[in-house]
Structure formats: C-alpha cells, structure tokens
Amino acid sequence: MILRNEDLDRQRCRAEFVSAMIEDLRWLGIAWNEGPDCGGQFGPYAQSERRAWYLEAWEQLRDRGVIYPCTCSRKDVAQAAAAPNEGDDEPLYPGTCRPRELRSFAPPDGRRRPSLHDPGGVNWRFRVPDGEEIRFTDLHLGPQCMVAGRDFGDFIVWRRDDVPAYQLAVVVDDAAMRITEVVRGADLLKSTARQILLFRALGFSAPDYYHCDLVRDEAGARLAKRHDALSIRRLRELGWTREEVREPGGTAPEWGR
C-alpha cells in the first residue's frame, strides 16, 4: 500500500495538514509500505514534487493531438446554453475552444495563441471520443458504462495557473507507482471513466477500482469538509474509538461522551 499526498492545491495543503493526516490514518490502524513519512521505491510521494512526470505526460498528449488549449473561464462554461449540468461534478463542456482537427491549436475568435511548449496561461483540455463507451467492472458496484460526450465532456488536464489537474496527476502517479487497485468514493465514478481514457492515451494499463458507498448523515446528505462534516480528529476528541469509526453502518455513540 502506498500513501500519496495529493497536494496540488497549495492554498489548502499545508504541512500541518499532512502531519495530521498521517497521524489520523495511523490511529485508525491503516498501515502503508511507502509514503511521505517513510520513503520507498516510487517516491517522491507529494504531487507538488512530481511536476517533471506530469509535464512529460502533457507533452505526450500534446504531441498525440488529444489535448487542446482552452481560454474559457468557469463562468463561460456554466453560462453556455449547450452545457447541461452533469449533476455530480462539473458542467458538460460546450466545445467552444475545441479545434475541428486533432492537431489544430488555433484559438477561436482571434484570442491569444498559447505556447505549445509551455502549458501555463490557458487551460488544456482532453478531447474525449464522442459517443465512445467506457466500460469497466467496479469491484464493489459491478459493471459500469459511461458514454464520452454525453456523461462527461472534454476535461481539463492542465490548469491556466500552470498546475496539472487532478485527472492527469493521479493517472501519471498510478502508472509510475505501479498501482494495481484503487479504493475511493462512489462520487468519483465519472472521474474513473475520464482517467481510463488518459491511461489509454498515454499507453498505460488502468488499475482495478473499488468505489465505496459514501458516508451520509441522517437526511442522506453526503458528509464532506465543505458541509462542516466531522473530521476523524474531531471524532477522536468526542471519544469515538477506532473500531466505532471503522465500523460501516454502525450506530454512532452519544456525542457528549
């Protein structure tokens, strides 16, 4: 097992958060063979230290003509009439900057032409094969099928602030670290379909996936940081044991104890 620190969002990822994450995971009884605290064969284990790997992948995708520069803002995409909301993550990209030919990088409407040697300054999107079915068998949820261009659109692989996007970074890391199984929440099913396309484009084999059911409150809402959900640290302070935290579907102890 590998512990990887996905710290590309430098505004929200601070050293004290990494230390707290490691402490909480060890308290839960989770052990790993490699990670930022113990090193290993496939380091470094912080994404902020792996830019060279991501840039090489960006160059491969650019040379193969499967990504293109995009000057659209989030507001542009959200307001586009042809961009229905996908529901779980982001609007469907309307294709405003998508070139007609795979290797044409000319921006529309006379906008600034981006450098083909430096990804910074514009977003770079992966051109999905419209109509193609992406199929995989989830180890928990069973057979899955999503259609590119319908269930998700062209997605960002490199951000305008010159930082690789999540989708590209995790694919590169999974391949470089020889990851064979990925366990994560069911809210990332569409991300898995996107990542499978990236694995194929880069010539890698995708790992197996196990998408867990989400932890929800009594009203059925997903517990998340942005909703002020309780952290493991807070549960520890409230007196929960590691067994109570780890028990799926278990009854929560009294809050005040």
Cite the ranges covered by each PLM segment.
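Short alpha-helical "patches" and their helix-cap loops
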Residues: 2-9, 211-214, 257
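Conserved catalytic-core subdomain
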Residues: 42, 218-257
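Residues that form generic nucleotide/phosphate-binding pockets
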Residues: 24, 57, 80, 96, ...
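N-terminal Rossmann-like or analogous alpha/beta NTP/dinucleotide-binding catalytic cores
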Residues: 1-86, 175, 186-187, 191-204
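Active-site cores that bind ATP or allylic diphosphates and position pyrophosphate for catalysis
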Residues: 75-224, 231-236
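Short coil/turn segments at secondary-structure boundaries
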Residues: 72, 92-94, 247-249
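Short, surface-exposed acidic
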Residues: 33-36, 206-209, 243-245
